[in-house]
Amino acid sequence: MRGDNTGVGKEPAVTERPAIKGYLYVLGSILLVTLAQLAMKWGVMQLPAWQASLDIMLAHPVPLLVITAGVGCYALSLLCWLAALHFTPLNIAYPLLSTSYALVYLLAVSIPSFAEPLEPGKAVGVIFILLGAVLVGIKPVGRKRNAH
């Protein structure tokens, strides 16, 4: 049935390559959604008082451009996420997406223009998020993980 071009009845080959590709797409989605959050935060911080007025936005084209780029990053993140779901089990990919919360917090407290305080309770929360993502991503000893 190799010559059949319909694809009916064929099982996808399970190899390490799709699993790696899936993790790369998850990583792309995480990085893009993080960039989107930071770009939109920076953009709205540059506007006088938050008003959804076209006049205010047109008077500040750079923040508007950065906000638009942030929305574009969300769109690209969605494309990466859809690709990730093709190659990665949902019960692995979705918890890994939570690392974006930790990454946004860590970058927001690290970038001086955001002036976000580093708070001990939140830092512990970030550690728990990252630990949870690692625990979900660990392959149990003696068990194989399917690519789909």
From Swiss-Prot:
Residues 1-23, 85-91, 139-148 are cytoplasmic. It is a multi-pass membrane protein. It comes from the Bacteria. One of its GO terms (molecular function) is carbohydrate derivative transmembrane transporter activity. The chain crosses the membrane at residues 24-44, 64-84, 92-112, 118-138. It is found in: Cell inner membrane. Keywords: Cell inner membrane, Cell membrane, Lipid A biosynthesis, Lipid biosynthesis, Lipid metabolism, Lipopolysaccharide biosynthesis, Membrane, Transmembrane, Transmembrane helix, Transport. InterPro entries: Flippase_ArnF, Small_drug/metabolite_transptr. Disulfide bonds: none annotated. GO terms for cellular component: plasma membrane. GO terms for biological process: lipid A biosynthetic process; lipopolysaccharide biosynthetic process. Pathway: Bacterial outer membrane biogenesis; lipopolysaccharide biosynthesis. Residues 45-63, 113-117 are periplasmic. The keyword Acyltransferase does not apply. The keyword Cell inner membrane applies. Heterodimer of ArnE and ArnF. Belongs to the ArnF family. PANTHER family: 4-AMINO-4-DEOXY-L-ARABINOSE-PHOSPHOUNDECAPRENOL FLIPPASE SUBUNIT ARNF-RELATED (PTHR30561:SF9), SMR FAMILY PROTON-DEPENDENT DRUG EFFLUX TRANSPORTER SUGE (PTHR30561). Translocates 4-amino-4-deoxy-L-arabinose-phosphoundecaprenol (alpha-L-Ara4N-phosphoundecaprenol) from the cytoplasmic to the periplasmic side of the inner membrane. This is Probable 4-amino-4-deoxy-L-arabinose-phosphoundecaprenol flippase subunit ArnF. The lineage of its organism: Bacteria, Pseudomonadati, Pseudomonadota, Gammaproteobacteria, Aeromonadales. The gene is arnF.
